UniProtKB/Swiss-Prot annotation:
This protein's UniProt keywords: Ribonucleoprotein, Ribosomal protein
GO molecular function list: structural constituent of ribosome
InterPro entries recorded: Ribosomal_uS2, Ribosomal_uS2_bac/mit/plastid, Ribosomal_uS2_CS, Ribosomal_uS2_flav_dom_sf
Signal peptide stretch: none
Cellular component GO terms held in the UniProt record: cytosolic small ribosomal subunit
Name of this protein: Small ribosomal subunit protein uS2
BP term (GO), one: translation
């Protein structure tokens, strides 16, 4: 039983690449043809690459590894948050803060601040503080939660990154490569596939395409967790 079908990919519009004038020649091997000035991705290759990525995600999760889902473009934000949460993993779906990986200690200090304010809100501290101060703290909490909420329980560096549109997330890609953290990525015809360890050639601009592929990666993680539950039961 294959992980994904050609029909699913077609229905989600995974095969539509970018305009031919906006392309990276390194993606040529994943392009099937050109139609009306748009590159059409070879979905047979996508099927194989999804299966490879699925196995990789499953193996990392089976070894107890954490995977960080990254996608800050509008088309990816919702799917990244939903699927990472469903899989019990971490995510960045707003702005990638420089140093999230390469300067993780500093990021952890910001996360500690986030948790401290949350605690103050929960234990009644807000009720005894001046109103003006509470307003400021709530604003700070909102901002920290927006950018760090998806990684606030991440204790250390992730074992791998799953990225939607490595061109958009080039800082995340650079940080992961510097630290030799493997990257699984949805790579469109305008991206450089050489920077990604496990390439999924696909349309990264259609919400349905991003949702479909991201959900398959979450399924891979959940498959191992269900296996663990069966063993413990």
């Amino acid at each position: 039983m294959s992980v994904i079908s050609m029909k699913q990919l077609l229905e989600a519009g995974v095969h539509f690449g970018h305009q031919t004038r906006r392309w990276n020649p390194k993606m040529k091997r994943y392009i099937f043809t050109e139609r009306n000035g748009i590159y059409i991705i070879d979905l047979q290759k996508t099927v194989k690459k999804v299966e490879e990525a699925y196995r990789t995600m499953r193996d990392i999760a089976a070894e107890g590894g954490d995977i960080l889902f990254v996608g800050t473009k509008k088309q990816a934000q919702e799917a990244i948050k939903e699927e990472a949460t469903r899989a019990g993993m971490y995510f960045v779906n707003q702005r990638w803060l420089g140093g999230t990986l390469t300067n993780f200690q500093t990021i952890q200090k910001r996360i500690k601040r986030l948790k401290d304010i949350e605690r103050m809100q929960e234990d009644g501290t807000f009720e005894v503080l001046p109103k003006k101060e509470v307003v400021q703290l709530k604003k700070e909490l909102e901002r920290l939660e927006k950018f760090l909420g998806g990684i606030k329980d991440m204790k250390g560096l992730p074992s791998a990154l799953f990225i939607v549109d490595p061109r958009k997330e080039r800082i995340a890609v650079a940080e992961a490569r510097k630290l030799h953290i493997p990257i699984i990525g949805i790579v469109d015809t305008n991206c450089d596939p050489d920077e990604i360890d496990h390439v999924i050639p696909a349309n990264d601009d259609a919400i349905r395409a991003v949702k479909l592929l991201t959900s398959k990666m979450a399924d891979a993680i959940l498959e191992t967790k269900q296996g663990e539950e069966t063993v413990t039961a």
